[in-house]
Amino acid sequence: MIQQQQKFELLESLLWEPKNGYFLLDRHLQRLERSADYFNFPLSLTEASKALQALSMTCGSVKQKIRLTISCEGNIKLQAHTLDSGILKIGASVGIASQPIDSQNPFLYHKTTYRLPYTMALESQPQYQDVFLWNQDGVITESTIANIVIDTPAGLITPPVKCGLLPGTFRSQLLEEGKIREELITLDDLHSTQNLFLINSVRGWIRLKKEASRDVWKVVSNG
């Protein structure tokens, strides 16, 4: 399957802050290394770290979103962009993808520039800014840009990685800290969920609230 994909690069998106530097840098580099091993990409973490350090000296005094890519030849490319509110601005709508994803697809477990499963999901519901993905077993996995966390009476839960989702760095940190726990989330569970969050290491916590009588969730706070 991997050989059938168009040429792709490994990808990490990092938050850089003037006072704190790169958020969860070690976790990003560890995930990058795992993906390089899986896809057999040459990777020098030393060179990647040096490149990130050099870039940080030019980032100025405002938050930046850093895009790090590694080619199949091991070439490192960095881009910095001033952090804005992204596609999930206050009032943005998130729906449910019309078709399931295949949890056996290895690209769901690794962050790369190959995003066909995500673009297809978005194109299936073009009226929304983002959509929740679900697998062949009717289990919720993530959105196209973030991990999902549901607020339940028993605490905050997020789907296990085995369901077919990216092991987000912020998600991993929250699990380690005991702030969230893994539990299956079915489509039925989602239908009845009023309050939930989308999380990633660049945006932090994005809070959503369900609209009355519709399977649509609106962003009510961002970051």
Which residues make up each language-model segment?
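Helix-start/capping segments and mature chain N-termini
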Residues: M1-K65, T69-G223
